[in-house]
């Protein structure tokens, strides 16, 4: 591994201090560095690495921008995923999809072919399971390619440190990098942030609450791997099956807590942060458990997730952020976020990850007579579109744009809460950042013949958290 990636792990204060200096320097990069896009051309080409549902959605968001951008290469480890995404995107965008067979790449090194199909000023989309994020980002930096990467971007301390180090190189090359934490591009939340901090409508922020309580989500719960002679598309090996069921495995997604709750955690930390600052909790404690370990048909689930989480995050000034997550059929659904201050409160996301209307209230009772402000229909925008608008504008006009440090810290904060619940310990953000356990340390070496990063026992069950018993690692 490169010496650059073996640097002494940073603590939280050093990172925040350093990142502040880097951001300050990058603000001058447009003056000091050459334009990143080809002179005389606004055409941006895009390569899609990871052709699942979110990958197809990100490519669609990219091609919906002015210009318009064109999709020129695709990569995945599953042929049927690539074919499905290609057909769907070709039907929708026709002439904007220019991906002949020789620019369709299959395999664990397929990302190299896709990125090599681009020129400087173009964009690689990374929407694979997060274990591969640093691998793909490193190669894009080497090739001088701009990036859009999906959240979360890390699931453990070692990959968080690695991504922060890699991003120093991306900044030095003036690369533009977007991260799929789209809440900060939602207009109603941008207006709410201003009303909280510039207008002081609810006073000092002291409490935040996020709830994502739904039924079965994604691939969070998995029955036993059916074996090599299975009837699934492509007859996947255990490694390939785990990739296809990525929500079930901490190495591939950070598990359900990380993948499903990162948006609320990110935008609530934003609501705590004054303009120009990025505040994150300093510690967390939490509880969680798995009530049901069988499918409705009575077959055992073997994944690594809990079905309920309740995490308390604490900020340096004592403010609290509570994040409650539940994946349970028949339970009351809740999918909202709230901010409480010394004078009143706010609804951040009324529904979903960041859907409005957002609103502010005097006091802490939600009522029409207490309402001070609510966002209007003009703010019912699409943040997935907005984040690409910002990225493509930065590329074409050489504006500073790099969301990786924030993406890493939002992902790390989410992992902090998950770790606290899985171990039943109070854990600091410094401890999480500097933890030595890496879920998939050889992600850059995986091939179709590789064993899966986490192995089942003789009965087909994967190692799961045991709070209070396993306290130094999550399993």
Regions found by a protein language model. Name each.
Residues 22-96, 268, 471-475:
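N-terminal Rossmann-like dinucleotide-binding module
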Residues 50-55, 173-178, 183-303, 311, ...:
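Predominantly a Rossmann-like dinucleotide-binding segment in NAD(P)-dependent oxidoreductases
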Residues 42-45, 67-70, 100-102, 119-124, ...:
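Loop/turn elements at helix/coil->beta-strand transitions in domains of secreted/extracellular proteins
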Residues 61, 68-75, 89, 280-475:
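Glycine-enriched catalytic-core subsegment of oxygenase/oxidase enzymes
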Residues 3-23:
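N-terminal secretory signal peptides and thylakoid transit peptides that target proteins
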């Amino acid at each position: 591994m490169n010496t650059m990636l073996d640097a002494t792990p940073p603590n939280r204060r050093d990172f925040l201090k350093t990142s502040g200096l880097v951001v300050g320097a990058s603000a001058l990069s447009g003056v000091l560095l050459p334009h990143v896009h080809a002179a005389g051309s606004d055409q941006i080409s895009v390569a899609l690495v990871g052709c699942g549902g979110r990958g197809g959605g990100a490519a669609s968001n990219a091609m919906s921008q002015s210009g318009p951008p064109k999709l020129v290469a695709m990569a995945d480890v599953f042929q049927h995923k690539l074919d499905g995404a290609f057909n769907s995107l070709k039907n929708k965008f026709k002439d904007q999809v220019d991906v002949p067979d020789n620019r369709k790449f299959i395999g664990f090194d397929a990302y190299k072919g896709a990125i090599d199909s681009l020129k400087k000023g173009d964009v690689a989309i990374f929407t694979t399971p997060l274990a591969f994020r640093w691998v793909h980002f490193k190669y894009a930096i080497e090739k001088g390619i701009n990036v859009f990467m999906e959240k979360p971007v890390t699931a453990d301390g070692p990959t968080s440190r690695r991504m922060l180090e890699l991003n120093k190189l991306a900044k030095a090359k003036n690369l533009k990098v977007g991260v799929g934490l789209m809440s900060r591009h939602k207009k109603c939340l941008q207006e709410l942030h201003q009303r909280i901090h510039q207008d002081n409508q609810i006073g000092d922020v002291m409490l935040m609450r996020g709830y994502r309580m739904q039924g079965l989500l994604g691939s969070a719960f998995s029955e036993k791997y059916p074996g090599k002679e299975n009837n699934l598309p492509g007859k996947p090996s255990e490694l390939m099956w785990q990739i296809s069921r990525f929500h079930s495995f901490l190495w591939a997604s950070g598990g359900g807590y990380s993948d499903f709750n990162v948006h609320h955690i990110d935008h609530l930390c934003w609501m705590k942060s004054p303009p120009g600052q990025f505040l994150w909790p300093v510690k967390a404690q939490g509880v969680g458990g798995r009530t049901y370990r069988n499918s409705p048909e009575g077959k055992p689930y073997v994944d690594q997730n809990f079905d309920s989480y309740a995490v308390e995050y604490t900020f340096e000034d004592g403010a609290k952020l509570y994040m409650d997550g539940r994946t349970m059929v028949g339970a009351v659904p809740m999918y909202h976020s709230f901010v409480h201050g010394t004078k009143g409160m706010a609804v951040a996301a009324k529904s979903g990850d960041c859907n409005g209307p957002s609103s502010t209230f005097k006091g802490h009772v939600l009522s029409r007579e207490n309402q001070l402000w609510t966002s209007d229909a003009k703010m019912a925008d699409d943040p997935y579109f907005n984040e690409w608008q910002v990225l493509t504008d930065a590329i074409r006009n050489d504006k500073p744009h790099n969301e990786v440090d924030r993406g890493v810290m939002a992902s790390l904060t989410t992992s902090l809460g998950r770790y606290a619940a899985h171990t039943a310990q109070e854990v600091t953000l410094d401890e999480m950042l500097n933890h030595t356990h890496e879920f998939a340390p050889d992600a850059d070496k995986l091939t179709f013949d590789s064993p899966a990063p986490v192995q089942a026992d003789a009965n087909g069950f994967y190692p799961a958290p045991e709070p209070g018993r396993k306290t130094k690692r999550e399993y």
